[in-house]
Amino acid sequence: MATPVKKWLLRVAPWFLPVGIVAVWQLASSVGWLSTRILPSPEGVVTAFWTLSASGELWQHLAISSWRALIGFSIGGSLGLILGLISGLSRWGERLLDTSIQMLRNVPHLALIPLVILWFGIDESAKIFLVALGTLFPIYINTWHGIRNIDRGLVEMARSYGLSGIPLFIHVILPGALPSIMVGVRFALGLMWLTLIVAETISANSGIGYLAMNAREFLQTDVVVVAIILYALLGKLADVSAQLLERLWLRWNPAYHLKKATV
């Protein structure tokens, strides 16, 4: 059994490396090894963050980016889940859908930005479309994979007990595929922010990406670093949220009990 000290160390261990990097960064800036034209000091970044926060500009851009990300993820994730269920549950569905989806998946969706701008302009629908497209494929693939890798013995046993159709799907197939689906959700959440960063830096007049590009034009490297750190923190927050959902929805899974016990 882990001692309180060991538990505390395990909790703070993920922060050792980031804190060490910031400490070295501050030291290099203080002694003049690192020019502020190349990279501002942590103190300068904190000052820029405070200034943007106090003016309300940062929170306005953050709210807009978060709204775009959530709407795009909801649309793309829902479509990916539905299409994955169709392909996973039906051989005919797989024959009709999978080849086309795999072809689209191999087209870099960020390469579609010029076409998307022509179709939608630079309004919200362009960013939401790109985020939805980026998040669709990880959830589709992992949903299909989860369904196709369910233990056939469990399915046959459930059928022998009289389960079929919707009850079989709810009680056996969906729980069996859920771990794989959640992996797809975590990948999709990472791609959600990655896609939005590029979309906002190319075709936007608001959002965190726009804030960074606007700061670049005026050589405000401290604001650029603030935007980068914000994206990193938002990505981490999304990943932690997905982990919490895994623990909530998969608390019946012995693998998660084992993981908790080892910690």
Per-range role (PLM):
Residues 3-4, 31-74:
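Periplasmic/extracellular loop-to-transmembrane helix junction in inner-membrane transport proteins
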Residues 117-118, 147, 194-231, 250-260:
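Glycine-rich helix-loop "coupling/hinge" segments at transmembrane-helix boundaries
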Residues 1-29:
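N-terminal signal-anchor/first transmembrane alpha helix
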Residues 99, 146-184, 212:
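Short cytoplasmic-facing helical segments at TM-TM junctions of multi-pass membrane proteins
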Residues 129, 133, 166-198, 222-225, ...:
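Transmembrane alpha-helices
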Residues 91, 148, 179, 183, ...:
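C-terminal transmembrane helix and the adjacent membrane-cytosol boundary/short C-terminal tail
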Residues 71-101:
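Transmembrane-helix boundary motif in ABC transporter permease subunits
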Residues 102-138, 145-146:
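Generic hydrophobic transmembrane alpha-helix motif, especially the helices
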